[in-house]
């Protein structure tokens, strides 16, 4: 998992509440177990018409937001099924941070496990960032995880909270496997001792 320290990039506004995981990545794209290649189908039913042509009015199809790395959106983002393909699709598109008033619990946890920083803010602060994001290619926002600050294009600073353990994992690029490997020496010692004391196992 890539480390997340400080991210400066374009923020895309998606002022929709209750965006579920089927909207993020529809079920027909869940056959793969690869984490790559799903970005092209992110928000598929909102990005493309029935003929597969881009819908120009959808935010991520607009030139200013095609390379967005931050998504500012509505409450209860990521509700619905627990498919891990949802954060995979966001990450493959290039989204490393999602800011919303609230998230579905499973999606929220899956984001941290896949290197995406989900930030919960009060509605009024999300509204402010949404207004900033409407500036298009001028909507450059900096998310500083170490300082737990978001800096808007006007220089304003918004503080955010994050669990210390999750923060440590994001700063150091540690998912479940990475955390386990940190204890590789201790695990090897334990297994050797177990083999010596209980050879019948």
Swiss-Prot record:
Give yes or no: UniProt keyword Methyltransferase.
no
Q: Report the record's disulfide bonds.
A: none
What SUPFAM superfamilies does its record include?
LeuD/IlvD-like (SSF52016)
Q: Which reaction does it catalyse?
A: (2R,3S)-3-isopropylmalate = (2S)-2-isopropylmalate
Keyword annotations for this protein, in alphabetical order, are:
Amino-acid biosynthesis, Branched-chain amino acid biosynthesis, Leucine biosynthesis, Lyase
Q: Which InterPro entries does the entry link to? A: 3-IsopropMal_deHydase_ssu, Aconitase/3IPM_dehydase_swvl, AconitaseA/IPMdHydase_ssu_swvl, IPMI_Swivel, LeuD
Q: What is its EC number?
A: 4.2.1.33
Question: Does this UniProt record's set of keywords contain Membrane?
Answer: no
Describe which pathway this protein belongs to, using the record's wording.
Amino-acid biosynthesis; L-leucine biosynthesis; L-leucine from 3-methyl-2-oxobutanoate: step 2/4
Any single GO molecular-function term of the entry would be: 3-isopropylmalate dehydratase activity
Record's superkingdom? Answer: Bacteria
GO BP annotations, alphabetical order: L-leucine biosynthetic process
Cellular component, GO, one term: 3-isopropylmalate dehydratase complex
Q: Which PANTHER family match?
A: 3-ISOPROPYLMALATE DEHYDRATASE SMALL SUBUNIT, 3-ISOPROPYLMALATE DEHYDRATASE SMALL SUBUNIT 2-RELATED-RELATED
Query: To which protein family does this belong?
Result: Belongs to the LeuD family. LeuD type 1 subfamily.
Query: Self-association or partners: how does it assemble?
Result: Heterodimer of LeuC and LeuD.
Summarizing the function annotation, the protein's role is: Catalyzes the isomerization between 2-isopropylmalate and 3-isopropylmalate, via the formation of 2-isopropylmaleate.
| Name of the protein this chain belongs to | 3-isopropylmalate dehydratase small subunit
Which species does the entry assign this protein to?
Parvibaculum lavamentivorans (strain DS-1 / DSM 13023 / NCIMB 13966)
Underlying gene: leuD
């Amino acid at each position: 998992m890539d480390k997340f320290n400080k991210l400066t990039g374009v923020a895309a506004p998606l002022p929709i509440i209750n965006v579920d995981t089927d909207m993020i990545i529809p079920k027909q794209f869940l056959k793969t177990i690869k984490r790559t290649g799903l970005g092209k189908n992110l928000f598929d039913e909102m990005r493309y018409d029935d003929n597969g042509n881009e819908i120009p009015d959808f935010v991520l199809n607009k030139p200013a937001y095609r390379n967005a790395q931050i998504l500012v959106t509505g409450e209860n983002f990521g509700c619905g099924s627990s498919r891990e393909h949802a954060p995979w699709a966001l990450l493959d598109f290039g989204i490393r941070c999602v800011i919303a008033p609230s998230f579905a619990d499973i999606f929220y946890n899956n984001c941290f496990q896949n290197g995406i920083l989900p930030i919960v803010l009060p509605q009024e602060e999300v509204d402010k960032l949404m207004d900033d994001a409407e500036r298009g290619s001028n909507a450059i926002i900096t998310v500083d995880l170490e300082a737990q600050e978001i800096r808007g294009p006007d220089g304003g600073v918004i503080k955010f909270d994050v669990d210390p353990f999750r923060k440590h994992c994001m700063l150091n690029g540690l998912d479940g496997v990475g955390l386990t490997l940190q204890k590789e020496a201790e695990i090897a010692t334990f297994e050797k001792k177990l083999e010596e004391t209980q050879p019948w196992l």
